[in-house]
Amino acid sequence: MFNIPFFQRTPETFGLDIGSSAVKVVQFRPAASGPGLVALGIAPVAPDVVAEGTIKDPPSLAEAIKQAIGRAGVKTKEAAIGVSGRELIIKKVQIPEVPAKELRDAVQLEAEHHIPFAIDEVFLDYHVVSRRDGAMELIVVAVKKSKVVEYVGVVEEAGLNPVVVDVDGFALGNQFELNHPDQADEAVALIDIGASVMKTNVMRAGASIFARDIPFGGNNYTQAITQHLKIPAEQAEAAKLGQDVGVTWDALVPALETVSRELSLEVQRTFDYFASTADSERIGKIVLAGGCSQLPGLADYLSSTWGIPVELARPFERIEVPPAHAEAVAAAGPALAVAVGLALRQPGDKAE
């Protein structure tokens, strides 16, 4: 959805998902039967290099990007990247219906009432949700120019050319739209649980109708385990991932359950806000993505708490995966949803 207007089109874009715990690279080849995976690489990001979407250590992040690119074997330089976090504002607004040629100016005027930054300090984009009764409902997206410059700078430092800047939550929607082209006319909440940020995107009939980032994620689980068991953060993270580091799963359960309750409450607040803006529309299903989505028991717990189906994202459902990448895709699966959504982008493809 989000586009920087001054980059030019290229036919060989790849997805570069820059997270606070890992960098993920995905590239497809186009085909009449659908995209096929040609490159996949993941590299870890050290703690505190990226925090809640803010880059704290650009040189270290650039090295992680280079490592992921090397593991993927990507030969092109043109990347589609995503942003998330505190300097990203996503608002659902309503304005009187205006002619198409006047819409961007009208959105800018309305955005000034909803964005806590000076309008000349942000890149602004929008998506029309609906038109009815002489009014237009839109999702307005603003991200501080300084944040985009920060991300573009570190990507360029890694030797790449960022040609698309999207929003992580909307990239999540890109892959869902590809993999579920016959989505029923019900609201589906996509939730990507990253290390420090949860990205939510509510979709209906192939379009985003609500989106929000929540500063909560897998690091909350790691911190709770560290405090509960009095063990180092590195050991707690490994135990959370199911690695054999001398900690039984039963020992983790009290800490995990506490954080899962907190996660549920955070998301419920977002759902309540969505309901207040959506004319009593209700969410019919939840799809979890991100590295923390595969935490044993989490989907079942959330389903029982909210009383609606919860399932894991299948970002490669309609993508041809060669045998060489099958094991990595099976292992990472939902964690690659944003990278897949970014890999589907091309400059100019989302212009209104």
Label each region the model flagged.
Residues 1-352:
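Hydrophobic/aromatic-enriched cytosolic interaction surfaces used to assemble or bind macromolecules
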